[in-house]
Amino acid sequence: MTTNNLVLAGTITRSRQFDSPAGIAHTVVMLEHKSQRYEAGMLRNVYCQIQVVLSGEHFNSVSKNLKAGVEIQVEGFINLQQSRNGQNRLVLHAENVELKT
């Protein structure tokens, strides 16, 4: 087994909730991260957007608060997802979510 763990904080830019055909509750948010980090002794601006998927009943209480503008910290694993048009992207599957605001 190899390690696949990511912790990322940021601001939700959009959110949607739905139930799968199997009846599993899902919340999908777009998380925008902005920070500054040192790399090779130089300060660098860091920016990314990543889709975050929260699946299952244990996220029901937090999911109702996940709206655009809310700051969160997410811990989970990343997985490659292929869209209907064949585009690949990394998606963060949440295992823990903390509201920051």
Curated annotation (Swiss-Prot):
InterPro entries: NA-bd_OB-fold, Primosome_PriB/ssb, Prisomal_replication_PriB. PROSITE patterns: SSB. Keywords: DNA replication, DNA-binding, Primosome. One of its GO terms (cellular component) is primosome complex. Residues 1-101 form the SSB domain. One of its GO terms (molecular function) is single-stranded DNA binding. It comes from the Bacteria. Disulfide bonds: none annotated. One of its GO terms (biological process) is DNA replication, synthesis of primer. Involved in the restart of stalled replication forks, which reloads the replicative helicase on sites other than the origin of replication; the PriA-PriB pathway is the major replication restart pathway. During primosome assembly it facilitates complex formation between PriA and DnaT on DNA; stabilizes PriA on DNA. Stimulates the DNA unwinding activity of PriA helicase. Belongs to the PriB family. Homodimer. Interacts with PriA and DnaT. Component of the replication restart primosome. Primosome assembly occurs via a 'hand-off' mechanism. PriA binds to replication forks, subsequently PriB then DnaT bind; DnaT then displaces ssDNA to generate the helicase loading substrate. This is Replication restart protein PriB. It comes from Shewanella halifaxensis (strain HAW-EB4).
